[in-house]
UniProtKB/Swiss-Prot annotation:
NCBIfam families xrefs: 3a0501s007
Protein role: The central subunit of the protein translocation channel SecYEG. Consists of two halves formed by TMs 1-5 and 6-10. These two domains form a lateral gate at the front which open onto the bilayer between TMs 2 and 7, and are clamped together by SecE at the back. The channel is closed by both a pore ring composed of hydrophobic SecY resides and a short helix (helix 2A) on the extracellular side of the membrane which forms a plug. The plug probably moves laterally to allow the channel to open. The ring and the pore may move independently.
Protein's recorded name: Protein translocase subunit SecY
HAMAP family: SecY
Primary location class: membrane
Gene designation per UniProt: secY
Lineage: Bacteria, Bacillati, Cyanobacteriota, Cyanophyceae, Synechococcales
Length: 439
């Protein structure tokens, strides 16, 4: 995307224009209403489960609590409450990741996405729904079999009705997510995760306050250090999300009829973090997989692997290293999905634009690829460090009250907030230009 140089509205102007845009107000109301509806569904329980026994088991098993705590990021507490929305948006996110991987590997899907336009995107969206349904069905069966030990009347009927309730809840959440994306503001799936993370924040703050009131000076000092690190993490996330490298682009002089258009300069913005929050979500999902398998299978080998990959285990440096490698790998993957230097070079050539000092065509694609590689490795390593440092500080200070609201949650929160704010600004600008055209 080539951007011309011009004035960008500041935050105050955008807020005033947002307040005056009736269409935007309607979209915001739709978004808020659907988010509230989805949040209320968290408290609808799956029938036939002894919640007292489940709650006692959850509190007595640290590993189980850690797994449930991470998965609750995507369900907003639905899994720990065993509600019908227990799966949350996770099947849809997993399906989206699978389709993105297949699009990069299967030529037919790649052609569908690149060359079929809106019709191709609709087909991929439909495929994503089918994969979401299959993934939700698989997860719901596993959970239904697992919670049989807490059933009031265990048996095949309980397993079937529990699985169906979980699948129905997951599909309803997916539908709400797509409604928000189409008729609201922002990305529906991201906003649902955002809401679920925010829902866990009051509990973490309450536990931290109680710990500060009952603890000694070292405990209070540890809490202060942890909060400072969290604030620094937010600053680092904003830097990674907003950091861009502007490559100058020059459009050649051209003549249309009797008019001669002079050469104009613009720039090509390359983000420091092309993948946004997806690399961190995917890396976290991979890391939690051994814990899920360990709790569902009770296999000794899987338990040992999960223990070594735990940030609270005997070898936290293995967790940190593995987490960093996964973030870097997925950052490269998403960078290649979002921006193709060969296609970019061809588009610049068709528009009669070029990068100063670089020949059009293959040389341009190689130049952009080199810049993109350097940006990606820098952004990915910085993103990995931002994700690891708060966890390391938690281990050093032994303050675990933010266990469910760690660096991963902060990365997702700030990233989604920035992306949504940009979409609001884009909508306001487009409304302003539409008004100018009508006038």
């Amino acid at each position: 995307m080539v951007v011309s140089r011009g004035k960008t509205p500041n935050a105050q102007e955008t807020f005033l224009q947002m307040a005056q845009a009736s269409g935007l107000r309607g979209r915001i109301l739709i978004t808020v209403g659907l988010l509230i509806l989805c949040r209320l569904g968290i408290f609808i329980p799956v029938p036939g489960i002894d919640r007292v026994a489940f709650s006692n088991d959850l509190q007595g098993n640290a590993n189980l609590g850690g797994v449930i705590g991470f998965l609750d990021i995507f369900s907003g507490g639905g899994l720990s409450a065993l509600g019908v929305f227990a799966l949350g948006i996770l099947p849809y996110i997993n399906a989206s990741i699978i389709l993105q991987l297949l699009t990069a590997a299967v030529p037919a899907l790649e052609d569908l996405q690149k060359n079929e336009g809106e019709a191709g995107r609709r087909k991929i969206a439909q495929l994503t729904r089918y994969v979401s349904l299959g993934w939700a069905l698989l997860q719901s069966i596993v959970i239904a079999v697992w919670v049989t030990r807490y059933a009031v009347t265990p048996g095949p009927l309980f397993t079937i009705q529990t699985a169906l309730a979980l699948v129905a809840g997951s599909m309803f959440v997916m539908w709400i997510s797509e409604l928000i994306t189409e008729r609201g503001i922002g990305n529906g799936a991201s906003l649902l995760i955002f809401l679920n993370i925010v829902a866990t924040l009051p509990r973490s703050l309450q536990q931290t306050l109680e710990l500060a009131q009952s603890g000694d000076r070292s405990t209070v000092g540890g809490i202060v250090i942890l909060l400072i690190v969290f604030l620094a993490t937010i600053v680092g996330i904003v830097f990674v999300q907003e950091g861009t490298r502007r490559i100058p682009v020059v459009s050649a002089r051209r003549q249309v009829g009797n008019r001669v258009y002079s050469e104009r300069s613009s720039y090509l913005p390359l983000r420091l973090n092309q993948g946004g929050v997806m690399p961190i979500i995917f890396a976290s999902a991979i890391l939690v997989l051994p814990f899920s398998l360990a709790n569902f299978t009770s296999n000794e080998v899987v338990l040992r692997i999960a223990n070594y990959l735990s940030p609270n285990g005997p070898t936290p440096w293995i967790y940190a290293l593995f987490y960093l490698v996964l973030i870097v790998a997925f950052s490269y993957f998403y960078s290649s999905l979002i921006l193709n230097p060969v296609d970019l070079a061809q588009n610049l050539k068709k528009m009669g634009s070029s990068i100063p000092g670089v020949r059009p065509g293959r040389a341009t694609s190689q130049y952009v690829q080199g810049v993109l590689n350097r940006l990606t490795i820098l952004g990915a390593v910085f993103l990995g460090l931002v994700a690891i440092i708060p966890t390391a500080v938690e281990g050093a200070t032994r303050i675990r009250t933010f266990q469910g609201f760690g660096a991963t949650s902060l990365l997702i929160l700030v990233g989604v907030a920035i992306d949504t704010a940009k979409q609001v600004q884009t909508y306001v600008i487009s409304q302003r230009y539409e008004g100018m055209v009508k006038d």
